């Protein structure tokens, strides 16, 4: 049997079984706003404070690319009122299929006009390149050009996302207009103050040299005026050859880096081996805010914590 036909039959059977399960299960209280990226949940929680629930799947500490939807996750999707998506193929395949299957209302951030103009082409962040205009002419362009999809690391995009969520809630729950408006106003004030504080705090480290793994922090770095000396596209794993490890070490020493930033899910002991015998420090950068709870001030706390992770490492030397 053709493999495509087999997969199609499996999907039909999968959703048919789920449909039966949902009919039999009680309609308990589930989140009204749902997303798969925790920092988007932070933004939603700020606007939905005392209005409605916000929930994030996958569970805390699990990366989206390594997570498979569970039946209970699909129940959450079924009972949610709104789904916040980034779009452009970044969400898990079956998550989007489930959202479409249950005909849920969605906010696709990359389709929002004011956000489209803030999207950055990956080449924008390379030194010596001519600055590209932040415009997207049509859907085809966003599908064919590689854009940085870690939108929540941009305070500007976060603000536009908050406005969209505000408008969505206002349309759905006009009786809670006072609270929803108050939440957006509070978010704007807190974000503005936080941005000023962070820009002031990073002044002392702006000229410090550092490396990151993967080009995932560019929105944040660009906004706050930080400039990495370079990035390593591939994080060394357990099976990585010694030659590549020494190549990384030589690059760090050549560029006189004083810090290398990694993500919590990486094997830190490999970096310890690379920087052994040098003055180079290492530090975690948590772009998902795994230890931050979903509360009204989560997003600004996330920005502060991320900036402090930069500062704590770069101020050591």
Swiss-Prot record:
> Which organism does this record belong to?
Buchnera aphidicola subsp. Schizaphis graminum (strain Sg)
CC per GO annotation: periplasmic space
Identify the stretch annotated as signal peptide in this record. Answer: 1-31
The UniProt entry, under NCBIfam families, shows: PRK09545.1 (NF007091)
Query: What is the name listed in the Swiss-Prot or TrEMBL entry for this protein?
Result: High-affinity zinc uptake system protein ZnuA
Keyword DNA-binding in record = no
Q: Which family does it belong to?
A: Belongs to the bacterial solute-binding protein 9 family.
> InterPro entries recorded for this chain?
Bact_metal-bind_prot9, ZnuA, ZnuA-like
Q: Where in the cell is it found?
A: Periplasm
Cysteine disulfide partners in this protein: 259-313
Summarizing the function annotation, the protein's role is: Part of the ATP-binding cassette (ABC) transport system ZnuABC involved in zinc import. Binds zinc with high affinity and specificity and delivers it to the membrane permease for translocation into the cytoplasm.
Origin, by domain of life?
A: Bacteria
Whichever gene encodes this chain, its name is: znuA
One GO MF term on file is: metal ion binding
């Amino acid at each position: 049997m053709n493999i495509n036909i087999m997969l199609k039959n499996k999907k039909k059977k999968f959703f048919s079984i789920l449909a039966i399960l949902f009919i039999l299960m009680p309609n308990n209280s589930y989140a009204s706003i749902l997303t798969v990226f925790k920092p988007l949940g932070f933004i939603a929680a700020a606007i939905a404070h005392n209005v409605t629930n916000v929930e994030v799947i996958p569970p805390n500490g699990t990366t989206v690319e390594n997570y498979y939807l569970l039946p209970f996750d699909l129940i959450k999707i079924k009972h949610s009122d709104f789904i916040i998506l980034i779009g452009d193929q970044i969400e898990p395949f079956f998550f989007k299929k489930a959202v479409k299957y249950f005909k849920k209302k969605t906010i696709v951030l990359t389709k929002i006009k004011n956000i489209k103009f803030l999207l950055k082409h990956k080449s924008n962040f390379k030194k010596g390149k001519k600055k590209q205009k932040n415009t997207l002419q049509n859907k085809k362009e966003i599908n064919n050009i590689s854009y940085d999809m870690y939108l929540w690391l941009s305070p500007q995009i976060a603000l536009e996302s908050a406005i969209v969520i505000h408008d969505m809630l206002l349309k759905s729950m006009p009786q809670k207009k006072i609270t929803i408006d108050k939440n957006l106003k509070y978010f704007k004030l807190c974000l503005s103050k936080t941005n000023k504080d962070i820009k002031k705090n990073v002044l002392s480290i702006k000229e410090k040299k550092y490396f990151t793994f993967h080009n995932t922090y560019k929105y944040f770095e660009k906004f706050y005026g930080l400039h990495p000396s370079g990035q390593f596209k591939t994080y060394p794993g357990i099976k990585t050859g010694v030659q590549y490890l020494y190549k990384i070490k030589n690059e760090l020493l050549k560029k006189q880096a004083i810090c290398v930033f990694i993500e919590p899910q990486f094997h830190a002991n490999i970096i310890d081996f690379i920087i052994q015998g040098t003055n180079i420090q290492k530090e975690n950068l948590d772009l998902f805010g795994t230890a931050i709870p979903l509360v009204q001030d989560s997003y600004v706390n996330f920005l502060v914590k991320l900036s402090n992770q930069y500062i704590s490492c770069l101020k050591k030397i």
